Amino acid sequence: MAECGRGGAAGGALPTSPGPALGAKGALKAGVGEGGGGGGRLGHGRARYDSGGVSNGDCSLGVSGDEARASPTRGPRGVALAPTPSAVVCTLPRESKPGGLPRRSSIIKDGTKQKRERKKTVSFSSMPTEKKISSASDCINSMVEGSELKKVRSNSRIYHRYFLLDADMQSLRWEPSKKDSEKAKIDIKSIKEVRTGKNTDIFRSNGISDQISEDCAFSVIYGENYESLDLVANSADVANIWVTGLRYLISYGKHTLDMLESSQDNMRTSWVSQMFSEIDVDNLGHITLCNAVQCIRNLNPGLKTSKIELKFKELHKSKDKAGTEVTKEEFIEVFHELCTRPEIYFLLVQFSSNKEFLDTKDLMMFLEAEQGVAHINEEISLEIIHKYEPSKEGQEKGWLSIDGFTNYLMSPDCYIFDPEHKKVCQDMKQPLSHYFINSSHNTYLIEDQFRGPSDITGYIRALKMGCRSVELDVWDGPDNEPVIYTGHTMTSQIVFRSVIDIINKYAFFASEYPLILCLENHCSIKQQKVMVQHMKKLLGDKLYTTSPNVEESYLPSPDVLKGKILIKAKKLSSNCSGVEGDVTDEDEGAEMSQRMGKENMEQPNNVPVKRFQLCKELSELVSICKSVQFKEFQVSFQVQKYWEVCSFNEVLASKYANENPGDFVNYNKRFLARVFPSPMRIDSSNMNPQDFWKCGCQIVAMNFQTPGLMMDLNIGWFRQNGNCGYVLRPAIMREEVSFFSANTKDSVPGVSPQLLHIKIISGQNFPKPKGSGAKGDVVDPYVYVEIHGIPADCAEQRTKTVHQNGDAPIFDESFEFQINLPELAMVRFVVLDDDYIGDEFIGQYTIPFECLQTGYRHVPLQSLTGEVLAHASLFVHVAITNRRGGGKPHKRGLSVRKGKKSREYASLRTLWIKTVDEVFKNAQPPIRDATDLRENMQNAVVSFKELCGLSSVANLMQCMLAVSPRFLGPDNTPLVVLNLSEQYPTMELQGIVPEVLKKIVTTYDMMIQSLKALIENADAVYEKIVHCQKAAMEFHEHLHSIGTKEGLKERKLQKAVESFTWNITILKGQADLLKYAKNETLENLKQIHFAAVSCGLNKPGTENADVQKPRRSLEVIPEKANDETGE
């Protein structure tokens, strides 16, 4: 067995710079030899169970004594697995009452001493529940039977107790207890609310809170003093059952029994009955098994026929029924059992005022508070209901049943990918060098590099996928017709003319933006002229041959070059007067053949430079993509023209990326750089494109014929701008003066880190992996969440394994990632089958961070080769905090927040150039003011969220919805109202209220004051920072000469230039953060306003009709204009 976190890289073809933390499982056996960061930390063996640690998502804690006793667990083949705590294996909701629990079993006394690694080692068991939860009645029944829960106390002690609901549903009891039985209970009528997660003072201040899963924790708030009973379930399933059941009891009180009897979801039952009757046209009262199975499959296409048949047979067997006819009652029972997703039911009841369906207002609340949808109204809600609700009754009444809600959540409307990015959404008017360009290497090959066949289908496929740079390796062919193949190899040949014809047909099939033909020319003068004839005749005026403007400093934009084809190739020098001349030959194929037998790889600079004859006609087709040889960065900065392009072998590019990352980034701000795979990758494996994107390299050529992790990254990355083949690089890679190191393992100066919160809830309809072992149809899935980006962002987390359930596994595990450069980050979901011999690939989905939609989302899984897997998906929840907000992420709890004295302020560096240092010195006060405004606002908002009983992931609309029930008295008269007549909504007490509510109102007032301070002072502070930035930029052009006059030499002068760049980056970043914080604050005020109106808490007559609907919380804020940057 291999420990998670050990192990080597996936068998790469060559060593490269350390890549993201991606395991061999993450590499998914995708192309033998995938290197360049594709290896990562995970070994091929099974993960080791670490009995001392706690899995996020597993609700057991490290224990000792009798409670730590573990018994061997049998796998599906009867193989004994590593011992696991019994609390891990969940057969829910039916649990036998424990007979021998110790009376006071404190399992951990001092959590602060329980130090554990952040990297978890997991392979936990999670067996399917015995019965699906599909209604409130199921939850109540489970609670009456009882469950073992862990009771958390403020003294860092945790007690095992058996909790159950009294049969009369009036009290919540637990046993054993030191108290007598009458005191070890809470009256249901005294319960104020039920909170999910670790959102009480006891959880936040508890020393072992970090070892408790957020998904398994919940709290019962009861009594006039709002005391909390803090509990931890053995699984998120059990926690959901208790939370749902208790909330139902609170809502209906003494009427619960009546509601349960009358709320067996009559609308749903009627609809399913109607489906049955449409088949039973003769009113026989039964239908054939075949018809019953087909009907359920039509209603839920993802279900397997074998599973439906098995369920009917099990039902008949339990009734000792002969024959295969299916009655209406049996049909309804099986439909409910197979087509109810408990995780979606639990979500529905959170927002349903009826507890069995969503009306238009419930749906509006869900869309606004959870999904971040702006400008929502009842008409839009009705449209959604009419589109997705299957029952006619629901459509007529405006009700969305569990089936309609499931249909909606599984529709493309709720996919994780933001539909705004399905079209071109970026500025396409910047220089060509400011974009990443989707690029193909040896496009003509459809297999390996040495013996594989060449085919025009390679060009068709690449162009249809949005590729904007293809390669043509052209050689002399028979009958005076040039051919394309990899020279010095045994690859087959295709005629040049047929390739140009295909390019003409498909060049702009997927994108209207310019296509680059990377021409590697090895032809004689005679056949070069034939090439020119073919290109001119077939491509015509699509060819861009305009001479570059020597007065310009940057390449034209993709917008200007729409519909144009650029030739990247060698070009004769301007002083060549003849009809032909000689140029250097950059032959990738020759390099490969030279290296094939060499064990030690030399650098490309050691390969002898050859020269060949180039005809003038072909040279004249080359305009702004003239191929030149790279020498060194300082030479390029001085002599290279903006229209000249250098190509880098992967090995050489990796060397520069590791040794000269700053120079490489600066070089790519002005010039195009093409990186092609090492010639040693004869199997057509791919390098990691992120290794070179992080340095700003625009044209990273990929072997499109080889699927796997690296192509997943490439395909996923270029989806973010309408799949047009061009993606605008991060601002920090484009701005003339900016400080950025490609290999940073810390936060990026001037860029706000953001926290990505991902909860993997469930999976649906996972197919059996191709070529997997002899396990029949058994699938034991688990999920990896990977972050790809700069080294500081590369990370991965995995869920537990759910054994023998590929149809509807429940994971319920939450992960958190800090993203330091969001514009270059990608998220990859990988589903694997936990096979005993080698984990098999099931599916994956890769998405740029900037394309994530927050809220509850489905992730459509794709196969190894990129095809969508029918009906296979992950159900996840996504939240992003500190997005455009700035500052380091806050830790949990009030006690760890930093006051002004301990607050960390952005620091500026000293250049030791007096005049320049004076300017930067003047920037320190506004930087401090900006930090104080932002952090005071953030701290106040977090304090209010905590008092509302929510985590920092929640938004203020959710906070207002959560706290609104507390503001109502026993007769539903408001104890607190919001005055919305002014810009800053105020809370007003209505008579005498409990101290707990006074505390909420006081905290709310403090939050409003911090929001007000930021809004009213942000503009002035922003202008001061921008003014200092502009003043400093006046020294930029002559900084070297000024430093020399000050006596700085060589190293110190270079250090001064670096410090100047750092300071400018910090100033720009601080200005941006303040601007974003103001936008966030205005959004917060809008959310408060509309939540108050939605809950009916606004003071009559104070609603401000002029307030606009809140923008989507993730709406991209436009970048500042260049005149604000001081450039």
Swiss-Prot record:
Species in which this protein is naturally found: Homo sapiens
Residues in C2 domain copies: 734-863
InterPro entries xrefs: C2_dom (IPR000008), C2_domain_sf (IPR035892), EF-hand-dom_pair (IPR011992), PH-like_dom_sf (IPR011993), PH_domain (IPR001849), PI-PLC_fam (IPR001192), PLC-like_Pdiesterase_TIM-brl (IPR017946), PLC_EF-hand-like (IPR015359)
Domain PI-PLC X-box: 426-570
Known role: May play an role in the regulation of Ins(1,4,5)P3 around the endoplasmic reticulum.
Record bears the keyword Cytoplasm: yes
UniProt-annotated stretches for the region Disordered: 1-128, 1101-1127
Modified sites of kind N-acetylalanine: 2
Name of the featured protein: Inactive phospholipase C-like protein 2
Predominant localisation class: cytoplasm
Keyword Phosphoprotein: yes
Pfam families from the UniProt entry: C2 (PF00168), EF-hand_like (PF09279), PH_12 (PF16457), PI-PLC-X (PF00388), PI-PLC-Y (PF00387)
Compositional bias per record (Low complexity), positions renumbered to this chain: 19-31
GO molecular function: GABA receptor binding; inositol 1,4,5 trisphosphate binding; phosphatidylinositol-4,5-bisphosphate phospholipase C activity
Gene that encodes the chain: PLCL2
Phosphothreonine: residues bearing it: 84, 584
Biological process, per Gene Ontology: B cell proliferation involved in immune response; B-1a B cell differentiation; gamma-aminobutyric acid signaling pathway; negative regulation of B cell receptor signaling pathway; negative regulation of cold-induced thermogenesis; phosphatidylinositol metabolic process; phosphatidylinositol-mediated signaling; regulation of synaptic transmission, GABAergic
Subcellular location: Cytoplasm
Domain PI-PLC Y-box: 618-734
Transmembrane segments annotated in the record for this chain: none
Keywords: Acetylation, Cytoplasm, Phosphoprotein, Transducer
Composition-biased stretches (Gly residues): 1-11, 32-42
Cellular component, GO annotation: cytoplasm
PH domain mapped to chain residues: 141-251
Top-level taxon in the UniProt lineage: Eukaryota
Modified residues (Phosphoserine): 17, 1113
Compositional bias per record (Basic and acidic residues), positions renumbered to this chain: 1106-1127
